[in-house]
Design a protein with these regions (language model features):
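Conserved FAD-binding subdomain of flavin-dependent enzymes
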Residues: 57-105
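Glycine-rich loop(s) and the adjacent beta-strand/alpha-helix scaffold that form part
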Residues: 271-324
Length: 324
């Protein structure tokens, strides 16, 4: 049976992109696409972005916050890597620049405000450090090369391996300019996954030789919610897509089948965060369900000026749902 309707669990970039392509390439009606999400900021993960912002944001006196400031991470755009994203943004209009697509808006702004950082590293008493000298020794280079050139079918060797464990024979790398710049650019720690480091090395390999200036980084005109997410939201709303907010999907119902690899969703259970109630949504045979099985912010926590962010070892909402 040909599917005619779609349910999107979460309103993150991946699901919104899927909706755009269903409409433009699949000739679907927007009214047949429904998003169930906490808010229009992301996936089926933790508390809403607005809750955190309101708690930390003193709108009347921004510099008088007593808790701290939230600087959420963004996508570090690189045209040579983000080909699919730029294709997506070329399909939707900018919300601030009349007559431009969202991609043209970004290219126009970026061409006039090129990235060229003059001070990636600072050292007390010395000022700017020459980041051009990466500081890698031969063993660092060998281990990095092995990581980058590892075939995909061997990546499972890195299951549950931290970056510190991978480089245990050469901890020197963590005292190099390369590591200081790479970890702060891509939010890595030595406890992070070696698999994730390998994938980032593949994705952002162009930045390896220019990381001291980040000249390959392309920037949006405004923050990425306003320059990427908002154009998507406005376009999809204009196409008639349904956004059901304040919902966190907590469980799937599956059709009984003798086929191990045949997965058919027949229902969804979700929390109405606003009302504190549980809701059920039936899924018929004409509907396909899209779910992003993880989120980089899934188990994120926040600290403040006086308290470090607590460590959360529990599975986040998206990961817990995927495990079911």
């Amino acid at each position: 049976m040909r599917k005619k309707k779609a349910i999107m669990i979460g309103a993150g970039l991946a699901n919104m992109a899927g909706a755009v392509y269903l409409i433009q390439e699949g000739n679907w009606d927007g009214k047949d696409i429904t998003f169930y999400a906490l808010d229009t900021h992301g996936a089926n993960d933790g508390s809403t972005a607005s809750e955190a912002a309101e708690e930390y944001w003193n709108k009347n006196h921004p510099m008088e916050n007593t808790k701290g400031f939230i600087a959420r991470g963004g996508r570090m755009l690189n045209y040579r890597t983000y080909v699919d994203l730029m294709d997506l943004l070329d399909r939707i209009p900018s919300v601030t620049e009349p007559g431009m697509t969202a991609a043209e808006d970004t290219r126009d702004f970026d061409s006039k405000h090129r990235t060229y950082d003059k001070a990636r590293l600072l050292q007390g008493g010395k000022g700017i450090v020459d980041g051009h000298k990466l500081g890698l020794n031969n063993l660092d280079r060998i281990l990095l090369s092995r990581l980058v050139m590892m075939p995909d079918n061997q990546e499972e060797k890195l299951d549950n391996v931290t970056i510190a464990e991978y480089f245990e024979d050469s901890p020197h790398i963590f005292q190099t300019n390369f590591w200081y710049m790479w970890e702060t650019t891509f939010a890595f720690r030595t406890q992070s996954s070696a698999q994730e480091l390998r994938r980032y090395m593949h994705q952002m390999i162009y930045e390896f030789t220019q990381i001291e200036h980040l000249v390959g980084v392309n920037r949006t005109r405004y923050n990425q919610y306003e320059s990427i997410m908002l154009p998507l939201i406005k376009y999809l709303e204009g196409q008639g897509c349904n956004f059901v907010m304040n919902r966190r999907v907590t469980d799937f119902e599956f059709k009984d089948t003798p086929m191990q690899d045949e997965i058919t969703v027949t229902g969804l259970e979700m929390e109405n965060i606003e009302q504190g109630t549980v809701e059920h949504v039936a899924v018929d045979d004409e509907t396909v369900v899209f779910f992003t099985n993880g989120s980089i912010t899934d188990s994120a926590t926040l600290g403040d000026f006086n308290t470090p962010a607590p460590e959360n070892m529990d599975y986040g909402a998206a990961s817990s749902l995927w495990k079911k």
